[in-house]
Amino acid sequence: TSPFNDRSLTQLDSVTVFATAMMIRIKKGLDVPISGKPEQLVHVAKPVRHVGVLGVDHVDLKPAMLVAEGDKVKLGQALFEHKKLPGVCITAPGAGTVRAIHRGAQRLLQSVVIRLDDTEDEETFASYPVDQLASLTDTQVVDNLLASGLWVALRARPYSKIADPTTRPAAIFVTAMDSNPLAADPVPLITAEAESFGHGLTVLSRLGTMPLWVCKSPTAELPLPQGLSHVRQASFEGPHPAGLPGTHIHFLEPVDVNKVVWHLNYQEVIAIGKLFTSGRLSTTRIVALGGPHVKQPRLLQTRLGACIEELI
């Protein structure tokens, strides 16, 4: 386990600024030497029969359940609403039957498990022509993200809670790099979905005029949409935790009690791009399978919420 976490402070070596691009070099940190690094080729994983939503993935979650065990649900159907954030719902990552709702001490929600059907019924959402994405209103963006459940991809710092849709941050950070040990290299994954990644950034830029930081490694050449003046690039070089959003935020837009920023992962940006152009919720995700006990360390293309026991 890495001794550094996402809130670690690192020592800055140097900063180089090129207009809307910035290079930050970090010299203190640690690249944890763990064997079993995944081959950076994507393999299609075997199908799973169960998907789920974990309560631990959502800090300070207070759910108001909208389904019960035994209910049939569609992909994208709301499972529960966040009591502290009215209108923010977590939606089903697959179509099927709610097999279990697990709760812990003080009725803390642990998980909602769905057994998938052979045919996947799905909710559909608003979609827009590509040439209209750059003119969407703030309301159109927020409403579609809330309806689909993709709003929960936006996390607010400090505390990493789900972002409040009634507020706006000082900046939004897209994490397009990963310095965690055994992590997948985001660059080929983003390149393979270049169009959707660009569409997702365009949609996020419509949430306001705050800086939209795309944080990447120095060698990464990412497909960014043209004509968006507040989309900025920052390159981070150095050992772990150079690739974590907490590090990026610390150097670019430090937060405090009165200053909040939002962040999200590059795969969620791709999913947002697909949502707004197709009206469908994309559940495709790439995960890294690695470590000293893995016989074939590799990247797996699977689905959101996949049961790990069935996956491997």
Predicted regions, residues:
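Short, solvent-exposed loop/turn positions at domain surfaces
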Residues: L61, V67, K84-G87, Q296
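Short alpha-helical segments in extracytoplasmic peptidoglycan/chitin-binding modules
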Residues: V73-L79, G305, E310-I312
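N-terminal, Lys/Arg-enriched amphipathic/low-complexity engagement segments
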Residues: V17-L66, Q233-F236
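Short, charged beta-turn/beta-strand-edge "cap" motif at the junction between a beta-strand
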Residues: A78-G87, A105
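N-terminal amphipathic/basic-hydrophobic helices that include classical n-h-c signal peptides
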Residues: T1-T20
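Short coil-to-beta-strand transition motifs
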Residues: G87-A95
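Buried, small/hydrophobic-residue-enriched core segments of structured protein domains
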Residues: V88, H102-E310
